Amino acid sequence: MFCLCLSLLGLLLCWPAATRNLLELKVECPHTIGLGQGIVIGSAELPPVPLAKVESLKLESSCNFDLHTSTAAQQAFTKWSWEKKADTAENAKAASTTFQSSSKEVQLRGLCVIPTLVLETASRTRKTVTCFDLSCNQTVCQPTVYLMAPIQTCVTTKSCLLGLGDQRIQVVYEKTYCVSGQLIEGNCFNPLHTIAISQPTHTYDIMTLAVHCFFISKKGGTDDTLKIEKQFETLVEKTGCTENALKGYYACILGTSSEVVYVPAMDDYRSSEILSRMTTAPHGEDHDIDPNAISSLRIVGQLTGKAPSTESSDTVQGIAFAGTPLYTSTSILVRKEDPIYLWSPGIIPEGNHSQCDKKTLPLTWTGFITLPGEIEKTTQCTVFCTLSGPGADCEAYSDTGIFNISSPTCLVNRVQRFRGAEQQVKFVCQRVDLDITVYCNGVKKVILTKTLVIGQCIYTFTSIFSLMPGVAHSLAVELCVPGLHGWATISLLITFCFGWLAIPLLSMIIIRFLLIFTYLCSKYSTDSKFKLIIEKVKQEYQKTMGSMVCEVCQQGCETAKELESHKKSCPHGQCPYCLNPTEATESALQAHFKVCKLTTRFQENLKKSLSTYEPKRGLYRTLSMFRYKSKCYVGLVWCILLTMELIVWAASAETINLEPGWTDTAHGSGIIPLKTDLELDFSLPSSATYTYRRELQNPANEQEKIPFHFQMERQVIHAEIQHLGHWMDGTFNLKTAFHCYGSCIKYAYPWQTAKCFLEKDFEFETGWGCNPPDCPGVGTGCTACGVYLDKLRSVGKVYKILSLKYTRKVCIQLGTEQTCKTIDSNDCLVTTSVKVCMIGTISKFQPGDTLLFLGPLEEGGMIFKQWCTTTCQFGDPGDIMSTPLGMKCPEHAGSFRKKCSFATLPSCQYDGNTVSGYQRMIATKDSFQSFNITEPHITTNSLEWVDPDSSLKDHVNLIVNRDLSFQDLAENPCQVDLSVSSIDGAWGSGVGFNLVCSVSLTECASFLTSIKACDSAMCYGSSTANLVRGQNTVHVVGKGGHSGSKFMCCHDKKCSATGLVAAAPHLDRVTGYNQIDTNKVFDDGAPQCGVHCWFKKSGEWLLGILSGNWMVVAVLIALFIFSLLLFSLCCPRRQNYKKNK
């Protein structure tokens, strides 16, 4: 019966992957590989293997890197297992003397028995180490395959295969977006264990990393510090033990890649920390694999045995069990200097360093360590797109890596490339009718697809007229403009080149239609009038003479003659229309009328008696004799059309943007007579800047004007914070440990070394219903129920907002007086003449809120209104926290229940929550408020950022006192001279341009003003600059203009002497711009572009064409002359005109 119990427990090892034989071993690599000596590590859990097949297991490789052959060699192990004593009766009750252990020597290959200097020289010799470890019970073993490779293999290898038994392991090298760090909490973390000594705490971060350690035996030598067990005994303050002679050390790798850390090494903080954790958890801090989170084991009891089997006395001891294996079953004895390797399926060997004898050390140890370090700084992405088929091919790249990329309009497929430190991600956008929006590294990028379509139009037009590519390209640049402006350009060119042919042709078609329309209207009018007369006659007859219906056939008559004919013919059975005989009944007569062909005889006679309507011949003659072929008429219409089309062209080139942003205006700025106080009251989005510029005029003297410039920068949020620590996620484990004799304190259980655990013991069974049949009965034994959290990992940083402040920098230039101040809500900038106040802010943040960041700060975070800080329960937000003061574990509010069945092993049930707070949050992520940030700056106690989404708003009030000293302030000695340095970008409303201006300020020390980018007609962009005496460089970003625009740097109505022409808007690839950079509100009161401005713009465009590609002008003039010749041939002068002449 006991064997049946063991078999049932073995079924708990059913693995989800047992039905497939291809598993994945992932190796995470930074995407920039330097000349360091680091090692990358990856591991994979394999399905269980029957115990009988373990000795034949061999780790094979098809990878292209060099492998160390040392681990593939056969290694002698002592197999130490347990069994029921042979002299035990079949129905005997289990006791401490019921079972015994046995030992034998076996040869195993591929286990993690790593010789000296293998890992130490792996990076230098470019050799990789592969091995596997075993966790076994009495029936099966759980293999774990490890791969440790020089970090340079990240460059040479992408994928390969390993084989162990029937299983195939796909080794996948995956490059992260980290330049050189490890990916933890979505951040790229570089552990620097010495930084805590030399730097203040707010300059570095602390993260929790996994640690994989492998024991390396080193026999010989005189260095007693390598007697590792002595180091453990010192830590637990154990004395009086006979010296354990084993020499060796652990070689540890931190996280996914690091240099090798040697344990023990007292001069290394990391080594000391790992040694301390090994002392606390001698078998490891990773207790279970994921599929075995809820499982049971039965403790058989404590056994001793011999290793090697030839020993005369017992040299090893441990706890025998049946059920799910927990820790490694491979270890090494510490008593002798010669290494003795132990394989103990179904036995947890003694690892308590407080004991003196029969101790072992595991060959592999997995745990966690908290280390200080730096988080790599991220850079913004550059995104560009090219037109491809019906959609667009886009690519995003960043100098330091892309940690987050998404798009609501594109399919981001994560196909990525690395070029040095730069990471590139390619994706496809299926639609180009809308602008492409991409969120990359926390920044919103917008790619204007209108420019892509322009480029495709230019390419198509140039391809069609490929015989003259230069001319075709120049014409395409002018024609391929979207909207009314483009159609106006097309109509202008058609009118100029072919107007003398199109005008008479269209006139002829219009005249023909008018003639047809006139005739149809006349014909319709005649018939309708006749019918109207008939109806009126009928109505009058009915009023005077009575009914117009025949009494015999009941037919309605329209005239008196028709009624008289009915009265004479119908009573005699004769048709009144054709006079043919028929029956004198209503039905017969009505049937005859349907086939009679003369029923309209009386109407026709009446119509003939009326005079026929003749249309007036003058209308036809005027339309027919119109001289649409006259050169005078054609030339007049041609000139009028050109003029009107030029006006439409100029007017359509002006794009009025109703949303906050730049509006194209003419030169100069607005003038306000200061009759009363000037007051502005407005609401400004948090990410927007505001510029207001006017000239304040003295109402009493119009010659006295004071330049006034008001500048408000975007909002900065200042939060005083408290760092609560790192939120952790973990696997919930529920374990049942049962033994049928002794008290519950007789044995130690696995969860008792876990960070967070809860245990309840059901001691001494009082009934037969909860005992397996081989147990001794009631009054003894123990069922220990435990829950613990395993595989803890950091998922995010948590900050609590203690106080909030919203600030904006405000600058005022009034004449020569300049004042700047950073104001916050309910604060003001006050001068003798001006008062600026932030009255309030509409915000979604409140003091007491908790901010959670699941990655870099630039990725944004989540707002929690309720965050647990004390007495947290498992499943609450903030349930598991790693703080500077240590781990904070949650309370488990549930209760245990022991499930019993007669003659079976009892099991534990837990009725509380089994889902961590982090996993609950991910399942309901959309229910939490989120926010984005840009330009973050964080210290120990403060966090500052800018809201890029304009989700917050400030209420601003500005008052300028009318009692200004115009006599003093109107005299402005500041002299501004401008010149153009360079220009980048394209004209038009697509990608825009960047104009670099050189601005010289003289006669005063500083001056706050705005510099515009304008052509001769209007302005397209502005930049506020605080000029200082001497030369200043100002960058002005604008959008608009046309092919003839020469963009100049302008201040008020003064512009640079020369201008520069921007490129055509058809770049091969269009680069996205930052949405936040365009969120500006500019108001200088300059007049809108009027009729004079339109003609000026049109003239500049025509001059631009004339001064550009002269071949284009020549082709247009040639087409014009050709159309004149065709006009002369098709529309010659009239012959009679020639004779009269």
From Swiss-Prot:
Residues 616-639 form the ITAM domain. Keywords: Activation of host autophagy by virus, Disulfide bond, Fusion of virus membrane with host endosomal membrane, Fusion of virus membrane with host membrane, Glycoprotein, Host endoplasmic reticulum, Host Golgi apparatus, Host membrane, Host mitochondrion, Host-virus interaction, Inhibition of host innate immune response by virus, Inhibition of host MAVS by virus, Inhibition of host RLR pathway by virus, Inhibition of host TRAFs by virus, Membrane, Metal-binding, Phosphoprotein, Repeat, Signal, Transmembrane, Transmembrane helix, Viral attachment to host cell, Viral envelope protein, Viral immunoevasion, Viral penetration into host cytoplasm, Virion, Virus endocytosis by host, Virus entry into host cell, Zinc, Zinc-finger. Residues 1-19 form the signal peptide. Residues 612-653 are annotated as: Inhibition of interferon induction. GO terms for molecular function: zinc ion binding. A zinc finger (CCHC-type) spans 550-570, 575-596. The modification Phosphotyrosine is found at residues 620, 633. Residues 762-782 are annotated as: Fusion loop. It comes from the Viruses. The chain crosses the membrane at residues 490-510, 633-653, 1110-1130. Residues 521-538, 593-610, 597-608, 616-630, 1126-1141 are annotated as: Binding to the ribonucleoprotein. The record marks 653-654 as: Cleavage. A motif (YxxL) lies at residues 620-623. GO terms for biological process: endocytosis involved in viral entry into host cell; fusion of virus membrane with host endosome membrane; signal transduction; symbiont-mediated activation of host autophagy; symbiont-mediated suppression of host cytoplasmic pattern recognition receptor signaling pathway via inhibition of MAVS activity; symbiont-mediated suppression of host TRAF-mediated signal transduction; virion attachment to host cell. Residues 20-489, 654-1109 are lumenal. Disulfide bonds join 29-154, 63-160, 112-131, 136-141, 178-188, 213-252, 381-440, 385-394, 410-429, 457-480, 740-775, 744-782, 756-889, 770-900, 785-908, 811-820, 828-837, 868-872, 974-1004, 997-1049, 1014-1019, 1050-1055, 1089-1093. Glycans are attached at residues 137, 352, 404, 932. Residues 511-632, 1131-1141 are cytoplasmic. One of its GO terms (cellular component) is viral envelope. Belongs to the hantavirus envelope glycoprotein family. TULV has the ability to regulate IFN induction although it is not pathogenic. This is Envelopment polyprotein.
